[in-house]
Amino acid sequence: MKKIIVLCCLLCAGIFAFAQDPNFHIYLCLGQSNMEGNAKIEAQDTCNVNERFLMMAAVDCPSLGRVKGQWYKAVPPLVRCHTGLTPADYFGRTLVERLPDNIKVGVINVAVGGCRIELFDEENCEEHIASQPEWLKNTAKAYGNNPYRRLKELAVEAQKAGVIKGILLHQGESNTGDKEWPQKVKRVYENLLRDLNLQAKDVPLLAGEVVHADQNGRCASMNEIINTLPQAIPTAYVIPSSGCPAAEDNLHFTAEGYRKLGVRYAEKRLLLLEKEPNSGITTEPASTNIPGYDYPRVDKEGRAHFRFYAPQANRLQVDCCGKKYDMWKDAGGLWTATTNPLPVGFHYYFLIADGVSVTDPSSYTFFGCCRMASGIEIPEGEEGDYYRPQQVPHGQVRSCTYYSETQKEFRRCMVYTPAEYETHPKKRYPVLYLQHGMGEDETGWSTQGKMNHIMDNLIASGQCVPMLVVMDSGDVEAPFRPRPGKDVNEERALYGATFYDVILKDLIPMIDRTFRTKTDREHRAMAGLSWGGHQTFNTVLPHLDKFSYIGSFSGAIFGLDMKTCFNGVFADADKFNKKVNYFFLGCGTEEQMGTKKMVDSLRKLGIEVDYYESQGTAHEWLTWRRCLKEFVPHLFKH
């Protein structure tokens, strides 16, 4: 008898011992009309479908050239010949976009509009169908009058090619109020696991909510029951539908609603996959996180993954790089979102909780956008090592408080001293005054800008001379708001204008008194980014007796007549070129600050000016880090 049992087990195991491709992930999809697809398929839904996203035809469909049981590129419709868009469409699209390139994703979708969950009870299906209306009977015929059996047969065939990695369910409208629904779903789920020789730990069940109450869902009360499903099935996860737009009948989703819901199914599956060994999904905590916090995380494609616990919130968004991403909440009150691939470098971001913009408590904060903001660093490759700390001598960034006679107030500036400053007590150093941009402050260059690491690395490599770098507030922390009835250009000229007296009458004298500096113009430079570039021009050009090096990075310098501006300082090119030891203008290729046009105008006048373009960057900190790296090696070598 034991031999017979062993033989039967071996035969059973042999059924599934196909040459499965572990990199072909297959998902079984079932449910009623919202899984079947009720929304019209739009042009965007049929374009750019990745070759790695496949569907197995659940029925013959001659008009589409599809044969039951065969794999095809997953161009909708995915269910039957004339069904609409489904959550499975954007579930699969999102997975192949986020997963490694060697992973394929396949879906098998068997769904019947208007059905109860009992339709997927294989043993009692025929009895159940007999009591249903003719239209439902006709749909069931497409699946041989037993949708469960059809799904199982297709799944067995699919297992010859790949590995079943999950089950997607969207059903419940026709079972609204049925408190036994979770147990009925459990029966279907366990039957599939048994019949396909699957383990629950490897094949989670993802069940979507029906149209939410926030969309006036007619069956929204069913969501309370759906959310108890994990109590019946520990490996079940509920996909929230809040914020997914509903159709006019308030039973089905719009195409946009299906897209959002499909992405949410995918987001949940990706989160689960991250925990699996050898999943190929790699994310790392952002370097800008507070130590000990795992989120936000960044993946190899540059996407940022956010989590935020706010069980009482009704709506959350992430505002990052000028785009707002809706977050979605699970049953435990944990909100998640994933961005599109972001440019490398530093980016401010905010969480918007029920309309209120707040910082992320998991992230360090940075002063930017005229307020304290969260920030995230999307890492560069080795080309970004110049602004990362290396095994070289490190300087210091000091916070210095001083009294401003011109403003009658105490102020703070940040001062970088090179690594050798303490060990060479008799040596004096040149000074670079370095300004931030609009809506930022004196901390910007040493936090967002990584100025100290850039300087340490350049000095250690011998590319630039040791120097002090002084950063003060440009008095432009608050937004620019012209007064009503005033000329905007005149108002703009006043924005941050208090800084000009501060730097000339308070800051430079204080630095020269406090630190071992070389105090002549030949050893003093000034540069700034954006509005700091504007302030650099306004400070240096009228006072060339105090500065001999000038830099502007994406300078906010507009509407100047190069021949007449600043009392005609550029009119006599020979005089200017002899007076200024080095003149630098830089910007990113993706921004429109007019820098190149200004350079062309200056060169036509005979002005010697170096021009640098940061490839692929816009008005952002990566541009300015690169500009600083290009600028400082030219200082104080004349």
What is the predicted function of each stretch?
Residues 168, 173, 195-220, 470-473:
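Active-site segments of SGNH/GDSL-like serine hydrolases
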Residues 107, 204-209, 218-248, 260-272:
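Extracellular serine-dependent O-acyl
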Residues 23-25, 256, 260-284:
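Conserved catalytic region of serine esterases and O-acyltransferases that act on ester linkages
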Residues 62-158, 176, 214-219:
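Conserved SGNH/GDSL esterase-like catalytic core that processes O-acyl groups on lipids
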Residues 32-41, 48, 120-121, 131-138, ...:
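Non-catalytic cap/lid and distal C-terminal segments of serine-dependent acyl enzymes
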Residues 1-4:
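Positively charged n-region of N-terminal signal peptides that target proteins for export
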Residues 25-85, 113-116:
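Catalytic nucleophile-elbow at a beta strand-turn-alpha helix junction centered on a G-D-S/GDSL motif
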Residues 9-18:
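Hydrophobic h-region of N-terminal signal peptides that target proteins for export
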